[in-house]
Amino acid sequence: MAKAGDKSSSSGKKSLKRKAAAEELQEAAGAGDGATENGVQPPKAAAFPPGFSISEIKNKQRRHLMFTRWKQQQRKEKLAAKKKLKKEREALGDKAPPKPVPKTIDNQRVYDETTVDPNDEEVAYDEATDEFASYFNKQTSPKILITTSDRPHGRTVRLCEQLSTVIPNSHVYYRRGLALKKIIPQCIARDFTDLIVINEDRKTPNGLILSHLPNGPTAHFKMSSVRLRKEIKRRGKDPTEHIPEIILNNFTTRLGHSIGRMFASLFPHNPQFIGRQVATFHNQRDYIFFRFHRYIFRSEKKVGIQELGPRFTLKLRSLQKGTFDSKYGEYEWVHKPREMDTSRRKFHL
């Protein structure tokens, strides 16, 4: 019985302490509210003395209250600074300094020494002598072969068929167990200029190999975020047979310049603008976003775009000299995450 009495007395003391702590918190909150209502800010030294750390408060409710008051104080100081800056800009009028540009990962990018200068003589010489020179000199016209990995599933097959409607003069061929080393000589003999291979894993497309014929290079991409036409909301009607316009964005380095020229060589030279179709390869933070749109002219001054599909995202894994050779091929560039991904502000394309 004595033990039961001790337990009841100790529990009663604990409940009294909790009530006292709750009343103290309510009084502190009420005092804080009254101070803010009267327009008088509590002194910083009293609320947060030098060397004060909120994490040192052992009482959870008290710690939460102090943290809330600290956040409110920070918010008020930030708002007051914004109002002060706005008044100063209004007072200066046209003489006000320009607004600072917000910092992003893109505009804080680490400078790459291989950034391409269009007026550089060395760049012009490389463009005139590289593997894509015959295409850009209009000596050859693109002819594309699109194939898959062995035993493709329906989603991969539909992606290949839809890609063939995006890229003019492209043909879909099913592997039937043939190795790529046997397919490439047959492509060269039939005057194909490029070979596209869509790989899959667990019935989902997850890779793309693009090989320029007959002398390479060969690029291997990781493919993600694949959306077929039926999966795109508010999509337009199926694309027409007009040659689309091609847009390449943000391929600035020597490596990115080569990849951009590789994509450009898939499409014929003279787009048919009457079809109002455009294929976009947009590079952002080394991710290449592919979109296929149609322009919608609502008036003489207003224009919109309507996505046709498909859409997907590519990430470059390697660039190999020559045609596809997994054993003895010479690689120009290979993505090594542990060595290359040391900074979020460093990009390679």
From Swiss-Prot:
Residues 142-325 form the Brix domain. The keyword rRNA-binding applies. One of its GO terms (molecular function) is RNA binding. It comes from the Eukaryota. The keyword Nuclease does not apply. SMART domains: Brix. It is found in: Nucleus, Nucleolus. May be required for ribosome biogenesis. One of its GO terms (biological process) is maturation of 5.8S rRNA. Keywords: Nucleus, Ribosome biogenesis, RNA-binding, rRNA processing, rRNA-binding. Residues 303-320 are annotated as: RNA-binding. This is Ribosome production factor 1. InterPro entries: Brix, IMP4/RPF1.
